[in-house]
Structures are given as C-alpha cells and as structure tokens.
C-alpha cells in the first residue's frame, strides 16, 4: 500500500494544501521500512524492541501488506489496555518507566496543531480546535488518534486523562460519538 500511494500523482505541492490522507501514513511506513532495511534492521523487530517490549504491549498486532510494509494508516490492532499505554506514553512526555521512549520534542510537536491543517492535525494525531471544543466539551489541549469505525485514544493533559474507546460504530456519525465522549470528559475534573 505504501508503494501504491507513493506512486500516485500529487494534486498540490506539499505544504500548500491540506487534505487528510491515510496513504501518506503508508508512504511514511514504506520510507521507514526502507531506511531501516538499509541498516540491516527489520521493521517489526525495530518496533518490537523500541515500543512493544518497553511498554509491555502484549496484545498489539501490526498488519503488513504483501510487500512487508506496515499498513500504518489503519492496521494496528490492540487491547484497550495497550492503546491506553500508548496514550499514557504521550501524556508523560514520551517517558515510560524512567526511559525516554519517544523524544519530548516529538511529543511537543505532536501536541501542537499544525497551521497547515487548519489546526486540526499534527504528527498523525487529531486536535481540538475552537469549533470542536464548543461542540463536544473537549478541553482545548485534547489531542487524539481516531481509528476506523470509532476507535479513539484521547489524551487530555489538563485532566491528566487518557480515554480509550473501542467498538464498531459504522452507522453512528462521528459527531454523535464525539459528543458522547465529550460528555464523559466534561465530568472529569481538571488537575
């Protein structure tokens, strides 16, 4: 999928227009796989050594395409506890058990919405903007991963809160689901 997406023609020059695309995540996976393999490192072994094992993610599966490239835009399957650990890593500035797993600079950049995405997105995480805060009762520091069918890992630093939502909600609108999650978040006191 990364190979296919990387050979699709650009419609706009990079940095001039924002449109969400899962394909770009698959391109990043392909680039990462190629860089790692140039150094004799297997992609899965790298992820396992640097993320899965340190965080104790025992119920997490990554899906790879036929070219052995991680389908990064949609194919991480995990338990709610494992997703929560991933969110907690970001809540704690990339530190797990005293070890810096993800650089604080990366986490800070992830927490800062990109102006190129109308302040909606950064480093594969969605952000709350003024519209979403008002509509769904989210604190403005909320950022989250949103997966197919209504999977969410929500990180809310002002409440010291991680919220994971799993389930199949293909027939429920995103706004209905986010409104429901916002009502739950609203009841959690700020720290």
Regions found by a protein language model. Give the residues of each.
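Active-site-proximal alpha-helical segments within enzyme catalytic domains
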Residues: 24-32, 74-95, 151-167
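Active-site-proximal binding-pocket segments
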Residues: 46-111
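Catalytic-site signature segments of enzymes, centered on catalytic residues
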Residues: 1-69
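Active-site Gly/Thr loop motif
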Residues: 3, 57-59, 112-164
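Stable alpha-helical elements in mature extracytoplasmic
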Residues: 1, 24, 43, 47, ...
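Solvent-exposed loop and edge beta-strand segments that line ligand/cofactor-binding
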Residues: 11-21, 71-77, 145-149, 170
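Structured C-terminal helix/loop/strand segments within mature extracytoplasmic catalytic/sensor domains
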Residues: 145-191
């Amino acid at each position: 999928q990364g190979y296919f997406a990387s050979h699709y023609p650009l419609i706009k020059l990079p940095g001039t227009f924002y449109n969400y695309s899962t394909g770009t995540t698959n391109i990043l996976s392909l680039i990462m796989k190629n860089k790692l393999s140039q150094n004799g490192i297997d992609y899965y072994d790298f992820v396992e050594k640097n993320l899965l094992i340190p965080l104790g993610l025992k119920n997490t599966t990554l899906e790879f395409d036929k070219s052995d490239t991680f389908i990064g835009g949609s194919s991480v399957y995990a338990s709610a506890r494992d997703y929560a650990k991933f969110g907690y890593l970001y809540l704690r500035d990339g530190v797990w058990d005293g070890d810096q797993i993800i650089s604080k600079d990366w986490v800070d950049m992830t927490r800062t919405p990109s102006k190129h995405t109308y302040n909606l997105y950064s480093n594969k995480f969605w952000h709350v903007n003024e519209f979403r805060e008002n509509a769904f009762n989210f604190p403005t520091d909320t950022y989250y991963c949103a997966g197919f069918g209504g999977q969410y890992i929500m990180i809310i630093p002002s409440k010291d809160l991680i919220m994971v939502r799993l389930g199949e909600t293909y027939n429920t609108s995103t706004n209905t689901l986010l409104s429901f999650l916002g009502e739950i978040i609203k009841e959690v006191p700020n720290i």
